[in-house]
Amino acid sequence: MRFMLLLMLVGMAHGALANPLRVCVGDVNVWPPFTYWQGSSAQEKAESLTGSATTLVLEALKKQEIEYQLHFMPWARVQHELTQATGRCDLTWDASYRAERAEYSYFSVPLYTIQLGYFTLPENSKDLNLATDSDVLCGVNGFNYQNFALPREPSLTLNSVQQALNMLQKERCDWFVSEIEPIYGGIMLGLYQLDRPIQHHFLGKTKEYHVQVRRSLPNAMPLLNSLNEYILQAQSSGHAQAVFDRFLSITQTE
């Protein structure tokens, strides 16, 4: 009975996607080792798009024989398009859960979990919890800091990760608050440039990332169910871990 129900759900998902699924990628900041690319044109980005999360999501779509088109745009625009019944985006990933996002989209089971923290210069390793009003906490525009439980909001927000790293190295930021793994991933892949070494500090908190599907997409739930099935199967079989290990292995201890 459960097998027949699954076949029905998959069939419904196929029927709902007579047109190619519009898959959107936020293109202001790469997110290595999970999602990254090279080049500046849409074609260059599409041809070089890779990463551990990207691999799993696109594998899931291909397994269900779902045709898709890639669209690159700023992350804020991706979220705006997902709110629209006739928007340009049907699906994205590397999305953290927010209550307001859940009003217009469905979230998959967790695709991966990463650690939250902040970066300092080794010679200026201040404790964030001892920040004074004159100290500068830097962040990136559009990033979700809800789960960080910060003692205060970033006082200076930059337009990109590289800009935030630059400000930290110029000592115009005392701390750069961020997810840990994507920063080291970008550095190791040569996507972020450093003139001075930086040091990470864990906040003892983690953050889950998901596939995000537009609620108003016809038969969005069957599509979500098929994605969840693939993700859970990949995780239980060890395939997901093998994919993540292949792209980058980041140490979990300082």
Give the predicted meaning of each segment:
Residues 67, 147-159, 194-196, 230-254:
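Ligand-binding clefts/hinges and TM-proximal coupling segments of bilobed small-molecule sensing domains
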Residues 54-63, 212-246:
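Extended ligand-binding regions for polar small-molecule ligands
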Residues 83, 94-103, 175-206:
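A ligand-binding cleft/hinge motif common to bilobed small-molecule-binding domains
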Residues 28-29, 113-117, 191-228, 248-254:
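Periplasmic-binding protein-like
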Residues 71-133, 142-145, 201-204:
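Acidic, polar ligand-binding/catalytic clefts
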